[in-house]
Design a protein with these regions (language model features):
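Flavin-dependent oxidoreductase catalytic cores
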Residues: 1-204
């Protein structure tokens, strides 16, 4: 904070639950299992918000390299998911609400909403109205349909044909070391994806 002007908003993104057992996983019970146990996460957020003055925090859970079904609920995963993606969405919401309930004045950003596709704005609105978070963050849906906020503000329903299909190819682009975007909806990223796949095949 000392390095920036007073009108600069300092924010952070924080993983509050790893989704794998103690002692390697954060946000789980020391007694075993992988159910969320967020007492340490609540304390950590308190340090960031109350002690250090952090005003804006984006919450995430899971590890995209180990358990992407926790981190990004999707229909298409690199392995058979052990749960319905809606279970993952519900977990994300519950974890976020635990933090928001502990610090009602903290501006919290909810994540993991893109799985709901054209219904994601309704989930976001309900989450805000019911105190789960104060802002809704969208990653995959914003890649697929960059104009979706305009549609929401105009009171129009989202076109399912423009929404994210949760295929994970935007993540693959990042792992290629490339720029990320929607491979399905944007031909620029379709070509970029194919170029990276072809390049990888040649190296193999």
């Amino acid at each position: 904070k000392a390095a920036v002007s007073s009108d600069f908003c300092v924010a952070s993104r924080l993983n509050i639950y790893d989704g794998f057992p103690y002692p390697y996983g954060f946000g789980v019970s020391e007694n075993g299992g992988v159910e969320p146990e967020l007492s340490e996460a609540v304390k950590l957020v308190g340090i960031l918000h109350k002690d250090l003055g952090l005003p804006l925090l984006d919450i995430t859970i899971g590890n995209p390299y180990f358990n992407p079904h926790v981190n990004r609920p999707a229909d298409i995963q690199p392995y058979e998911s052990p749960e319905d993606p809606l279970v993952g969405v519900a977990r994300m919401l519950a974890c976020t609400k635990t933090i928001q309930d502990a610090y009602p004045d903290l501006v919290l950003i909810g994540s993991g909403l893109s799985y709901l596709r054209q219904f994601a704005p309704q989930l976001a609105a309900g989450g805000i109205e019911n105190g789960y978070f104060k802002l809704a963050g969208f990653g995959r849906l914003s890649f697929a349909d960059p104009d979706f906020p305009r549609e929401v503000l105009a009171g129009r329903e989202l076109d399912p044909g423009k929404c994210c299909i949760t295929c994970g190819k935007c993540t693959q682009l990042m792992r290629f070391g490339s720029m990320a975007g929607c491979v399905i909806r944007d031909p620029v990223y379709t070509r970029l994806y194919q170029e990276n796949v072809n390049s990888k095949e040649k190296r193999v």
